[in-house]
């Protein structure tokens, strides 16, 4: 076996690997391009070549250097990004290329259990994942959903909500402003930069590999769902809504419309993505659509035994700054700018 380091955004070896392997959207060159365009990180991947020179395994990663120190993440701001390996020997061959960097390494696994058996990595967090098989007929998908979901969808339809595809960056901006407010006022969190969503729009929506569904009440945008597409899977990536219009139940209707869009495109799975375990309401919400549930494992290699005192202090400061900038008295444009400056540190 031979191993090479490549740029996963444009190298043909990486493209061939993700085409033939059980890859997800977070392995895709487009997603990695979104990350590097937004944050300026260097993205790389190690690829193992078989005796014929064909790619047979690989792992993408970003090396990040900032006020928190140096670290390797596979991959930042991705729900999960399993190493594309089928055996323990290939996993060790890949990760042994990164260990000599002598900095923390973070990997998020959903489908691949091989890294969990590596004693050099420790489990530091778990999250929930939900997915829905789109292959059954629409009537069967409807029947599998909870009665409360049926009622919510019918209510939104009775009240005249209309769902359509976003057509412009002006509508993308309207979605982002809802997203910013949900993050700030509901969760006390900063939002990713608007440029992140612009890059998703450019690399996915304009490339016909994703879409933004909007729910409108009397011509007013009241909610939106951002979906990405990769291979045979539709990814439910972002949701936002106006609190004052939640009584119309737009979010259930949006997902039902997303399911139907996925079926029309011939897709086989709707990936509902990551939910933190303490987000009990979100977990219950995703279960109501008849989803399968699995666990995402967050693994970390700590060559120095854990965070340095400086890193701990900086992360505490980051938490305090988040609280300050998401205070309800802070103007939303200031909160947005804080996300532009600080969100890159949440890796």
Regions found by a protein language model. Name each.
Residues 2-54, 58-68, 110-129, 135-247:
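A conserved beta-strand-loop-helix scaffold within acyl/acetyltransferase catalytic domains
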Residues 47-50, 55-58, 67, 78, ...:
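Aromatic (often tryptophan-rich) hydrophobic motifs at membrane interfaces
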Residues 62-80:
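A short glycine/small-residue-enriched secondary-structure motif
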Residues 74-114:
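A gly/proline- and charged-residue-enriched helix-loop-helix capping module
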Residues 106, 164, 269-273:
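Short catalytic-loop micro-motif centered on adjacent basic/acidic residues
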């Amino acid at each position: 076996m031979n191993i090479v380091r490549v740029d996963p955004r444009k190298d043909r070896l990486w493209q061939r690997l993700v085409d033939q392997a059980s890859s997800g959207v977070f392995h895709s060159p487009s997603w990695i391009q979104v990350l590097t365009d937004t944050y300026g990180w260097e993205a790389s991947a190690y690829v193992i070549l078989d005796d014929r020179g064909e790619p047979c395994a690989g792992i993408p990663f970003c090396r990040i250097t900032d006020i928190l120190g140096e670290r390797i993440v596979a991959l930042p701001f991705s729900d999960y990004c399993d190493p594309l390996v089928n055996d323990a020997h290939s996993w060790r061959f890949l990760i042994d290329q990164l260990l000599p960097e002598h900095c923390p390494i973070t990997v998020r696994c959903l489908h691949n259990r091989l890294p969990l058996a590596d004693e050099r990595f420790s489990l530091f967090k778990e999250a929930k994942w939900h997915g829905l098989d789109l292959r059954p007929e629409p009537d069967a998908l409807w029947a599998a959903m909870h009665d409360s979901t049926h009622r919510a969808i019918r209510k939104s339809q009775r009240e005249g909500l209309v769902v359509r595809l976003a057509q412009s960056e002006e509508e993308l901006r309207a979605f982002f402003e809802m997203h910013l407010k949900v993050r700030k006022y509901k969760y006390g969190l900063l939002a990713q930069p608007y440029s992140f969503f612009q890059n998703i729009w450019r690399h996915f929506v304009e490339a016909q590999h994703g879409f933004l569904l909007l729910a409108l009440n009397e011509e007013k945008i009241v909610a939106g769902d951002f979906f990405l597409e990769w291979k045979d899977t539709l990814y439910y990536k972002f949701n936002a809504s106006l609190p004052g219009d939640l009584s119309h139940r737009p979010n259930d209707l949006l997902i039902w419309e997303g399911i139907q869009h996925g079926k029309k495109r011939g897709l086989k799975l709707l990936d509902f993505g990551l939910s933190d375990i303490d987000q009990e309401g979100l977990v219950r919400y995703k279960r109501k659509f008849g989803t399968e549930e699995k666990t995402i494992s967050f693994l970390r290699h700590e060559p120095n035994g854990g965070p340095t005192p400086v890193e701990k202090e900086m992360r505490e400061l980051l938490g305090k700054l988040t609280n300050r900038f998401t205070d309800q008295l802070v103007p939303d444009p200031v909160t947005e700018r804080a996300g532009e400056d600080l969100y890159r540190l949440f890796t």
